[in-house]
Amino acid sequence: MFRSIAALFILSSIVFSKETINKHQLQAVTNKSKETSKAKTEVLTGLDILLEQKPYFIQGRSIALVTNKTGIDKAGIPNYQRFMEMDDVDLKMIFTPEHGLFGKAADGEKVAYDSIGIKLPTVVSLYGNIRKPTPDMLAGVNTIVYDIQDIGTRFYTYISTLGLVMEAAGELNISVLVLDRPNPIRGDIIEGPILNMEFRSFVGYYPIPIRYGKTIGELADLMITNNWISPAPVLDVISMEGWHEKLWFDETDLVWVNPSPNIPDLETAIIYPGMCLIEGTNISEGRGTPHPFKWIGAPWIDGWDLSQALNKFDLPGVEFVPKSFIPDKIPGKAENPKFENQKCSGLEIWVTDRDSFKSVDTGILTLFSLYAMYPDKIELREKHLNMLWGNNILFKELVKGSTGPYFLQHYN
């Protein structure tokens, strides 16, 4: 493998640099070009099917809608607008997950609505002091409709909101209707451990793997069939047409809408399941930069040394490139980024082949390499790391001095 020597990249002159684009990065660009040039598969979401074929699921009903800006139909019209245009549907309430209705709240920021400037029913955030709808909020509601684009990762909190909404519905004998949408990082790939319920939290609410390989509708069904919710609500799922589990999101004809401020594109969603583990340390996961989760670093890291150490693992589908960056406060995206206004050195992650790339393996080897190279600088945030990983084994093996390959062989 021609990994340790940077290839020459000719623009107007030959440039020699530790960050010179090499042949693996050129392959990534080539692969991305092929991905975007493929013919798109026509997909109708659960919302499209509801509106065009099955409106009877909500006709004559008083509904509460759980959604955000990703809940649009094929024409790009928000679901709440479509429901408000239906004479025989009473939209009583809109509930929003983390980041709010318009996806403008930063990660972890509590959201409250007083006046949002447009004519809507009552809008209530389920990412403030209240994360589960109360009986008063659901008074007069007989169906809760859930329509949010997820990204197929356990600690992405929208699925925790789904579970809590279904719990409230079951307790109050309210039916739930889930409008299915694609798993953007495919529905046939599973990565990472199943959550140990001793470590249950809002970033891990059900015993599923980190990359769980289900659509949101399939996951809702799983919650019912596995008796994870009791009493269980009556659940209906309106499935998609045209989608299948081997499709990446950009292989569909659907429009990508950023599901949250720090997931700006599909490649970030692909990298996220493993690189979000960096949140469990004092190392920047790239918030406050244009490329969260693709860029990681700290002022005391040597990006060249770290990239070379990781490239030696010869992981499929990924190349590690030295990167320097300065995290900055970005309103609505990164309010308090790690190492704000400090120059960081670290990595840029290039996915050269997303079909073979394993995000969780990448995150694990990155963590073990960082811990081995900077034992006096890196800080592990034990509680948060355990919640993300789903048990305490990763933390224990890191502090014990195990190697990344050993961990992958025995525990992943």
Task: Annotate each PLM feature.
Residues G103-D107, L177-F199:
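Glycine-rich, charge-decorated loop segments at or immediately adjacent to ligand/cofactor-binding or catalytic sites
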Residues R200-Y272:
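Conserved anion/nucleotide-ligand pocket segment
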